[in-house]
């Protein structure tokens, strides 16, 4: 692999890592603020833990490639969190609103992984790591989506 390709892979992995860190923060925030059953809190805590494990797997791949792993969330994630804090201060938080926001974040994360996988810029080993991470992302997305639709029923 040439240096340019390696740097592209590291950049892609770090972008995904930053977005996953945003996801961890989002799930932790949702668990702390949801008013519903402890089942929701437990689900969000479990997802935050799962996402943290995925973050670590992507960081390990960045290190294997000789890069410096991302250790903070994205600027967009921080901006989105400030918006949510302002929105919550104005409108209050309720379970449905929190779950809707979590699902929005999951949609965004799933799209980021799909874009990375469809790009054709990942080598075999790195692609395998990203595909494994994507399985976790897709599972979380589907679980939150089902939760949201269950509340609407």
Q: Positions of the model-derived regions?
A:
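Alpha-helical bundle segments that constitute or directly flank the non-heme di-iron/ferroxidase center
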Residues: 3-36, 97-121
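Charge-rich, acidic-biased intrinsically disordered regions
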Residues: 4, 41-42, 69-85, 126-134
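Alpha-helical scaffold segments that form or flank carboxylate-/histidine-based iron centers
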Residues: 8-16, 38-57, 95-101, 125-137
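Amphipathic alpha-helices that form helix-helix packing interfaces
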Residues: 16, 23, 54, 61, ...
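Secondary-structure edge/capping motif, primarily at the C-terminal ends of alpha-helices
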Residues: 30-35, 62-65, 90, 117-120, ...
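Conserved alpha-helical segments that form or flank metal/cofactor-binding pockets of metalloenzymes
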Residues: 40-76, 147
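Carboxylate-rich helix-loop segments that flank metal/cofactor sites and access channels
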Residues: 60-97, 101-110
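Preference for long, well-ordered alpha-helical segments
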Residues: 98-153
């Amino acid at each position: 692999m040439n240096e340019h390709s390696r740097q592209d892979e590291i950049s892609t992995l770090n972008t995904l890592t930053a977005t996953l860190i945003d996801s961890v923060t989002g799930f932790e925030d949702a668990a702390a603020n949801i008013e519903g059953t402890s089942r929701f809190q437990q689900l969000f805590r479990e997802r935050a833990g799962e996402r943290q494990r995925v973050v670590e797997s992507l960081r390990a791949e960045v290190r294997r490639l000789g890069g410096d792993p991302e250790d903070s969330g994205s600027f967009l994630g921080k901006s989105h969190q400030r918006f949510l804090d302002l929105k919550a201060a104005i409108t209050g938080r309720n379970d449905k609103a929190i779950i809707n926001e979590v699902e929005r974040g999951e949609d965004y994360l799933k799209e980021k992984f799909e874009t990375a996988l469809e790009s054709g810029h990942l080598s075999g080993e790195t692609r395998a790591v990203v595909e494994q991470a994507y399985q976790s992302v897709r599972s979380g997305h589907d679980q939150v989506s089902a939760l949201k639709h269950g509340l609407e029923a």
